Amino acid sequence: MNLKIRLAAMNFLEFAAWGAYLTSMGTYLMNIGLGSEIGWFYAVQGIVSIFMPALMGIIADRWIQAQRLLGFCHLFSGLFMFVAAYYALTQQAHIQFGILFTLYTISVAFYMPTLALSNSVAYNALTKAGMDTVKDFPPIRVFGTIGFICMMWIVDIMGFQPNQNQFIVSGICSIILFFYTFTLPKCDTHDDGEKKSVMDIFGLRAFALFRKKKMAIFFIFSMLLGVSLQITNGFANPFITSFKDIPEYANTFGVNHANILISLSQISETCCILLIPFFMKRYGIKNVMLIAMLAWVFRFGLFGFGNPGTGVWMFVLSMIVYGVAFDFFNISGFAVCRSDYKSGTSFKCTRSVYVDDQWYRGYSGDVICSGHCECPYSNDKWDGCY
């Protein structure tokens, strides 16, 4: 089979496992009475991202081939997703936050490192095949977004948004990928024998770069916009679904198929990537970042004023704007790091921004928002949230 097709299938399954629950889990937690705990379920993704990717990276470098480690991470992630789903199914109205959260956390702890591992496997395979990673990897990565969208649609159409079956779908995708990794090209381990400090392992030395005013400002805005992204992941679905309690909107498409409506964001994200080269060349990095920040304002403004009925056009436009908000800032942000620093330092810089963005947006975005909207079905605090 063609190498690009094989890697595209890997990316499809990689993000399908995430897309099965990432945007709909909030609605499920609301449904079982854990609405006030939504923030913690999303925050833990950021918390484990502080150390798990680094630890798995060390293992992949020194002891276990990356493609094999990718598979075993998905094996454990999938198994614990199954256990979480089984626990939820058997306990029903007696689900305890501590138990479900622990099972979910273990699953996520094994999943988050696979985002980097899958990239390493793809880059390694393309390099060995003599291909241009800059040119050939982006089209392969697009299939990850396609997989994410497909699972969103499947979970929606199958009626799994308000129940634990979305965890089962995620687990199935992970187990399939576990077996699939045995067919992927091998990645060599390369222990150079050099002893590294904790600062080096976790890339913390790169934070010295933020002593520069320019990077400090970028760092702050990266965290703040990261908070916005995580609020979208955790609360967009519960927000749209909450309109079902209003008779006027109870039977609208958006209320009954929130995941499909939200998937327009990912579709827009895929399309907007194509616009970035033109905007970067025409308007420059700073202006592109300003456009992204303004887009986030419109994203939440349209969300706050829209509804699934006559105002559904605001929801749709909000989803389209999301592509600009997400892509323009992320890619221009990486360009900032690469333009000011040498290659080795720029990698550490982008990695530090990514790690900090993951834990900070996960913790602050969803925990703060869940504190503000503990029970949106019984109050009108959604406007304040957005």
Spans of features found by a protein language model:
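Juxtamembrane intracellular "pre-TM" segments in multi-pass secondary transporters
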Residues: 1, 185-219, 245-250
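Hydrophobic core of transmembrane alpha-helices in multi-pass small-molecule transporters
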Residues: 12, 77-80, 93-117, 121, ...
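C-terminal transmembrane helical hairpin of 12-TM major facilitator-type secondary transporters
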Residues: 287-333
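Cytoplasmic helix-loop-helix junction between adjacent transmembrane helices
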Residues: 105-143
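C-terminal ends and interior cores of transmembrane alpha-helices
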Residues: 75-94, 294-308
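A membrane-interface helix-boundary motif in multi-pass transporters
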Residues: 157-173, 371-386
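Helix-loop boundary and gating motifs at the non-cytosolic
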Residues: 1-50, 214-250, 257-258, 330
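Central cavity-lining transmembrane alpha-helices of secondary-active solute carriers
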Residues: 40-61, 260-275
